Amino acid sequence: PNANESWKYTVVFNCVYGWHYAQIPSLGIWRSVKLESQAPVEIEAPFVSTRSLQGDMRLAVTLKKINAPLKGKLQIRVVPKNFEGAPQFFEHEINSSKKTEQFSFDFKIDAPRLWWPNDMGEQSLYDMTVAFIPRNGARPDVEKTSFGIRTIDMAPFPGGEREDRYNWTFVINGKPMFVKGTGWCTMDALMDFSLEKYDRLLSIAKSQHIQMMRAWGGGLPETDDFYELCDKYGIMVIQEWPTAWNSHNTQPFDMLQETVVRNMKRIRNHPSLVMWGAGNESDKPFGPAIDMMGRLSLELDGSRPFHRGEAWGGSDHNYNCWWDDAHLNHNLNMTSPFWGEFGIASLPHIESVRRYLAEEKDRWPSRPGDHFRHHTPIFGTMGEFGKLSQYSGYFMPDTTLGEFITGSQLAQVVGVRHTLERARTLWPETTGALYYKMNDNYPGVSWSSVDYYGAIKPVHYFVQKSFAPLTGVLLFDRTNLSSQEVSLPLYLLDDCRRLNGKDYTVSVTVYNDRLDTVVCREFNGHSELETVKNLGNLDLNRAQTKSTMLFFVVDVCSEGKRLSRNYYFTNYEVRRGVIMSMPCTEITMKRDGRQITVTNVGKLPAIGVYVESPGYAHEFIASKNYLWLDPGESQIIEVNVDYPVCVKGWNIN
């Protein structure tokens, strides 16, 4: 309601103008300034594209006369960037009388190594040096870039092409894939775009099995560091231009066009970049500006698709949970051919909340007008505290700030992980799911899995399980199963065909509120190239579901080894706080450098076991967290800090 509308009349990082998150418009020069001398003939924006996976490549390069003719040699050197290999050299004679001319050259990489998305293979990269040597002996010009050998095609849904839908099946290097992803929010309202900050967030995304990020039209084209790290980590990028909600109709056309041209030339060599998008949530993505973006995506690139809008043409955004106050059951059941956005907002880590509450950090409950309510999605003007109370209240009482935060974060876990898992089971009718979102540009309540200060929320570790290449998943249509007959579909998901040709066992064990075993059932099979396998249903009667809590543990085993574990919790609405009041067990912790071994030495399962480093949540990363440990079981957790750590859990003494 109090947004600064001026962003609609220029081209800026628009989500910090008060329509969301922050009202801190950034102005001025925000990158380093440098002077460069001009060569007699300049090389402009070399563009490398893949013609075939056998290493057939094409270089398009523009030569511009400054004070010497376009006569000389164009020399090209290609060398592996992140693996061992011999350099290759190519040379072309140039003899042109024009002032500016674009040249295209085909070349072939010997023994090519491909660039693959995260979890699908290696991210092989090459460095290229392009030099123009003038015939008259004048100073040469040299440009450097990097690239990957990677093809992208878009295939239709199984029903075939439709006029009202884009082709939404991503085919990378000839392989159709279900895309696992999230949204990317330009990461700082005051434009702190340091390499270290990028690397923290993107390395966390890699460990979450993220394969795609949608860099939305609420932000801006990122710095080179962002795309280089996405290349390194195998994270594909949908890059939208900075328009939102039909702002392309009022933004200066020339300024938008310059933004597109400059940035498209700058980033188009990155193999991680797989799609151009016109902007965010415009319900009428038409007109001269949108047409210009589409035309330039062909003229300046042509190797990747362009979409005129998002959500559009078969993709969906859904926020009935949160803005429409829908029950969590809504997210458990909703489906889409391709999820572009969905999620539930939650509070950050308690250390982060106390940090931005400052002198109000010990004030609870929250009062209207205080810092707590200001740091909500629209500054407390749209009933956000009531929404937080609703979703947190499904899990926890609101007696303390800590309980309120925990409940909010658990609601986010449930509202995200079930939608992602259901989407995966629907492949190939559903071809991808991008939850909203990875990160924040301002401290406060939001949909992110990592808060503004860098602290990781629980949803990260649960998405890590939901997006694991190999996992078993149960589908739930409601959060409360108490005293009801239920039949829960069970699926085996194996994106990388790790089980191909092998026998497997998927076991499901159900525990009640005394942590007694209610049901233990095994589903046995032999894998033959399936990435999605329906194993049947887990049936429970009313007596078996009559409990204030139910826990479901799904293990995938083969050749005598457990290969993955997933677990679920239901019935928590029967009594607030019951999820944290299960019979207790005891955990021991042993540290060896940055390796933490946690062991359940009690007689009952340990639920939600996690390690943290008090006071350093903004720096801390664990390789995995929120574990289910059977009695006697040990797990090793890698951490990234040398600070003291402690182990906690939902039922630990």
Model-derived regions: residue spans:
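Flexible loop residues that form catalytic
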Residues: 38, 218, 281, 311, ...
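Secondary-structure transition/capping motifs at alpha-helix termini
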Residues: 135-138, 232-237, 266-270, 299-303, ...
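Feature marks short, surface-exposed loop/turn motifs that line or immediately flank catalytic pockets
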Residues: 151-153, 186, 245, 346, ...
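Short, glycine/acidic-enriched loop or turn micro-motifs at the edges of active sites
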Residues: 243, 344, 603
